[in-house]
Amino acid sequence: MRRSTLAILTLALHAGLAAAQETPEAPRSAQNNAAQDEITPQLDRVVERALEYLSEQQQSDGSWTGGRFGKNVAITSLACLALMGDGDTPSRGEHAQAIRRGLDFVLENAAENGLIAAEAANGPMYGHGFATLFLGEAYGMTAGGGDTARSARLHEALVKAVRLIERTQNDEGGWRYNPVPYDADVSVTICQVMALRSARNAGIEVKKEVIDKAVDYIRRCQNTDGGFKYQLETGSSAWPRSAAGVASLFYAGIYEDRAIDQGVGYLHRVAAPGTPRASRAHYFYGHYYAVQAMYLAGGDDWGAWWPAIREELIAGQRDDGSWEDRPVGPAYATAMSLIILQMPKRYLPIFQK
């Protein structure tokens, strides 16, 4: 096993986030304070430029857009998480106003039935998952987001969003693009699991049986090579969803497990930063989850992965402070890169003990 004893996150129950609302002790690795060599002066400069760029891209309605994805709750939520990764909240910090405006945009797109999706959303459960994650983090960092009215709106939207996730789980244990319990894929499922983890951290009740079923589904999607297939039917592994699969098992409180060891090993073989053969498809999505998986694995896994992805992202920053993802756009790529690069700061509750 490649685990050290320093804890980095409060993880949920084995095969469940909320059994009796108790949190087990997690024998994890990275400390809640960044190690001396994790954050460099060069990284600080890169992050500062990226935060400035991202702030400037916010639209008048509080949203961020990307490529063909206008008025998008997923990109907006990720952008706000990136700003919060610097330690700011909706009520304090240099980027507080931008976070508040983004939060208001997300809340304005929260329907009575709990679904968070802008009008143009296609396959809204991805956006719903990221939006619920953002609401959970905002609620956890500020006990509601600042003023009383916003606090009440945030709490109500978060609870309704969690209940929608719970009632749209399908019989296999997963979720897919639309909020109906019909079919499932591992990618959308993992997005919901992380959202539920954040909500649970913020004190929102999450049904144990929902997470039990989700973990079982994710386990059944793992291939013999350690990677994860897209759906339960036979399929090949791909590293971005495999990174997400490993991270989700950690977030479900599974620390020492053959499935995790196999998944971490697969990522080292197939997707290590700087590996020429690693596919660039879904690059930022994949590394968003991969760095979390390695962060949770700790020890030599984190020690090898972190400086490599840090330097790779630094080298890829454009002159204006952004990163580019052709299908989705620079706001998305920059938000994802910032979340990755600021992870050692441990400001977001999901990355704290």
Each language-model region and where it sits:
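Predominantly the C-terminal beta-signal and adjacent terminal strand-loop region
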Residues: 314-318
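Large, well-folded core regions of big proteins
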Residues: 55-58
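An alpha-helical repeat/solenoid feature that recognizes helix-turn-helix modules
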Residues: 21-49, 63-98, 111-212, 220-308, ...
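Patatin-like phospholipase
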Residues: 103-106
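Bacterial N-terminal signal peptides
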Residues: 7-16
